[in-house]
């Protein structure tokens, strides 16, 4: 049985644990492919070494007083933990470094939609029946698992792939706690798919 941390309350989240990270834990990436995205903390590049992966590097100064190495390690550990708990994730493979920046090598999801762009109405889900059904079904499955395991996922966000499958991306932590806040985050995305399906049915 995979253990879920229960010693950190989500409301008191202070960032990654203080566990030290050995420098040789980070694999050197000699060169980067095309930049394919950017978030609040990381820049994302296509991997030249493995076209199935992308390299996500923390920008300097984006992790506050917490070393970026610890953030990267915690993201890798949490992603693996969620995967072992049966959640769909953008899989993380290794700790990486490039020219002084550190981060994580992850699956490259082609033509992905960011859930934050969807819920903030910056982008829309496609008006496609199967696509929206997949989003709805995946959201329902994630909600069921959150309830069954009684866990909260810190900084829960998703990528939606080109088929409408929903994948947890960039998680900060998973703790034994009320799942209500996490379920609310899932429902934000779910409501967009549901509205699309209602519109399709009315046409």
UniProtKB/Swiss-Prot annotation:
<dbReference type="GO" id="GO:0005524">
    <property type="term" value="F:ATP binding"/>
</dbReference>
<feature type="binding site">
    <location>
        <position position="40"/>
    </location>
    <ligand>
        <name>ATP</name>
    </ligand>
</feature>
<dbReference type="GO" id="GO:0043657">
    <property type="term" value="C:host cell"/>
</dbReference>
<feature type="binding site">
    <location>
        <position position="107"/>
    </location>
    <ligand>
        <name>ATP</name>
    </ligand>
</feature>
<feature type="active site">
    <location>
        <position position="155"/>
    </location>
</feature>
<keyword id="KW-0964">Secreted</keyword>
<protein>
    <recommendedName>
        <fullName>Type III effector protein HopBF1</fullName>
        <ecNumber>2.7.1.-</ecNumber>
    </recommendedName>
</protein>
<comment type="function">
    <text>Effector protein that targets and inactivates the eukaryotic molecular chaperone HSP90 during infection. HopBF1 is recognized by HSP90 as a host client. As a result, HopBF1 phosphorylates HSP90, leading to the inactivation of the HSP90 ATPase activity and chaperone function.</text>
</comment>
<feature type="binding site">
    <location>
        <position position="157"/>
    </location>
    <ligand>
        <name>ATP</name>
    </ligand>
</feature>
<keyword id="KW-0547">Nucleotide-binding</keyword>
<feature type="binding site">
    <location>
        <position position="114"/>
    </location>
    <ligand>
        <name>ATP</name>
    </ligand>
</feature>
<keyword id="KW-0418">Kinase</keyword>
<feature type="binding site">
    <location>
        <position position="109"/>
    </location>
    <ligand>
        <name>ATP</name>
    </ligand>
</feature>
<keyword id="KW-0808">Transferase</keyword>
<comment type="similarity">
    <text>Belongs to the HopBF1 family.</text>
</comment>
<keyword id="KW-0067">ATP-binding</keyword>
<feature type="binding site">
    <location>
        <position position="41"/>
    </location>
    <ligand>
        <name>ATP</name>
    </ligand>
</feature>
<dbReference type="GO" id="GO:0016301">
    <property type="term" value="F:kinase activity"/>
</dbReference>
<dbReference type="InterPro" id="IPR054555">
    <property type="entry name" value="T3SS_HopBF1-like"/>
</dbReference>
<feature type="binding site">
    <location>
        <position position="42"/>
    </location>
    <ligand>
        <name>ATP</name>
    </ligand>
</feature>
<feature type="region of interest" description="Disordered">
    <location>
        <begin position="1"/>
        <end position="23"/>
    </location>
</feature>
<dbReference type="GO" id="GO:0005576">
    <property type="term" value="C:extracellular region"/>
</dbReference>
<keyword id="KW-0843">Virulence</keyword>
């Amino acid at each position: 049985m995979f253990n879920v941390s229960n010693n950190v309350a989500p409301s008191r989240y202070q960032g990654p644990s203080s566990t030290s990270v050995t420098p040789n834990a980070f694999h050197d990436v000699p060169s980067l492919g095309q930049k394919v995205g950017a978030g609040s903390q990381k820049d994302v590049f296509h991997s030249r070494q493995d076209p199935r992966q992308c390299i996500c590097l923390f920008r300097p100064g984006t992790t506050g007083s917490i070393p970026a190495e610890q953030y990267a390690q915690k993201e890798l550990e949490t992603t693996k933990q969620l995967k072992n708990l049966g959640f769909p994730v953008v899989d993380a493979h290794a700790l990486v470094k490039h020219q002084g920046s550190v981060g994580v090598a992850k699956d490259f999801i082609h033509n992905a939609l960011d859930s934050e762009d969807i819920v903030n109405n910056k982008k829309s889900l496609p008006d496609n029946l199967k696509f929206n059904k997949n989003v709805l079904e995946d959201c329902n499955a994630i909600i069921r698992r959150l309830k069954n395991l009684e866990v909260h996922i810190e900084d829960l966000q998703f990528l939606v792939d080109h088929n409408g499958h929903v994948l947890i991306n960039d998680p900060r932590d998973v703790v034994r706690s009320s799942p209500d806040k996490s379920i609310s985050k899932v429902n934000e995305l779910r409501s967009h798919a549901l509205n699309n399906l209602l519109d399709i049915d009315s046409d």
